[in-house]
Curated annotation (Swiss-Prot):
Gene name of the record: acpP
Keywords (A to Z) from UniProt: Cytoplasm, Fatty acid biosynthesis, Fatty acid metabolism, Lipid biosynthesis, Lipid metabolism, Phosphopantetheine, Phosphoprotein
Name of the protein in question: Acyl carrier protein
A cellular-component GO term for this protein: cytosol
Modifications the protein undergoes after translation, according to the UniProt entry: 4'-phosphopantetheine is transferred from CoA to a specific serine of apo-ACP by AcpS. This modification is essential for activity because fatty acids are bound in thioester linkage to the sulfhydryl of the prosthetic group.
Organism: Ruegeria sp. (strain TM1040)
GO annotation (BP), single: lipid A biosynthetic process
SMART domains recorded: PKS_PP
Ranges in coiled-coil conformation: none
Length: 77
């Protein structure tokens, strides 16, 4: 797993309190990992802080899964 994926997974596990093995590429933050809309906003803010990037609102709405987050951050970094 890439450094970006490892760091994203750590953030997801810490913020959502889920088991690390539940965080798969296709895992939906809401449907599979139990996040609500506030959780997803907090995740985006944590990603921005961790990676020193800005995620515009329209882009944030497209980040629905762990894989989406890794792909977006990898391309933005």
């Amino acid at each position: 797993m890439s450094d970006v994926a490892d760091r994203v997974k750590k953030i997801v596990v810490e913020h959502l309190g889920v088991e690390e093995d539940k965080v798969t590429e296709s895992a939906s933050f809401i449907d599979d990992l139990g996040a609500d809309s506030l959780d997803t906003v907090e995740l985006v803010m944590a990603f921005e802080e961790e990676f020193g990037i800005e995620i515009p609102d329209d882009a944030a709405e497209t980040i629905q899964t762990f894989g989406d987050a890794v792909k977006f951050i990898s391309e933005a970094s």
